[in-house]
Regions:
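Conserved mid-core segment of classical short-chain dehydrogenase/reductases
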Residues: 46-51, 78, 99-107
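Glycine/Thr-rich phosphate-binding loops of Rossmann-like dinucleotide-binding domains
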Residues: 18, 41-43, 104-105
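Rossmann-fold scaffold of SDR-type NAD(P)-dependent oxidoreductases
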Residues: 11, 35, 69, 91-99
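The beta1-alpha1 cofactor-binding region of Rossmann-like NAD(H)/NADP(H)-dependent oxidoreductases
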Residues: 48-51, 67-82
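A glycine-rich helix->loop->beta "capping" turn
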Residues: 3, 60-65, 83-96, 102-103
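Canonical Rossmann dinucleotide-binding motif of NAD(H)/NADP(H)-dependent dehydrogenases/reductases
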Residues: 2-39
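Generic hydrophobic, amphipathic alpha-helix propensity
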Residues: 17, 50-53, 57
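N-terminal Rossmann-fold cofactor-binding loop
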Residues: 35-47, 71
Length: 107
C-alpha cells in the first residue's frame, strides 16, 4: 500500500517564517495548503503571495495549494478546513503563523 503524503496547512505563508516552513514541508513531499490574504503582488506593503509560495512548495517536491483566507474571519477558516477535509480526508499538520502586520498608530 502506497504511503499517502502528509497534509499540512500553513497560515500566513505568503512570506517570512510561514513561507519558509511551507517550502520546507514541500521538500519532504508534503501536500501543503498555503494560506494568506496576498494573492497578487501589491496586495500588501511587503512582497510575497500565496501563489508564489505554492509554486515554491511544488518546485521543492511537494504539492503546493494556494488558498486565500483571512484568518480573522471564522467563516473563511471553516471553509478552508472543510475544503482540506473534503479533498484530503484529514489534516496532519497545522502551522498557525497568520498575523497582522501594520502600524498600530494607524489601526
Amino acid at each position: 500500500m502506497a504511503q499517502q503524503p502528509v497534509v499540512a496547512i500553513v497560515t500566513g505563508a505568503s512570506r517570512g517564517a510561514g513561507r519558509g516552513i511551507a517550502v520546507a514541508l514541500g521538500s519532504h513531499g508534503c501536500t501543503v495548503y498555503v494560506t494568506g490574504r496576498s494573492e497578487n503582488e501589491g496586495d500588501a506593503e511587503v512582497p510575497g503571495t500565496i501563489h508564489a509560495t505554492a509554486r515554491e512548495v511544488t518546485e521543492a517536491g511537494g504539492q503546493g495549494i494556494a488558498v486565500k483566507c483571512d484568518h480573522a474571519d471564522d467563516a473563511q477558516v471553516k471553509a478552508l478546513v472543510d475544503r482540506v477535509i473534503a479533498e484530503q480526508g484529514r489534516i496532519d499538520i497545522l502551522v498557525n503563523n497568520a498575523c497582522w502586520q501594520g502600524n498600530v498608530m494607524n489601526a
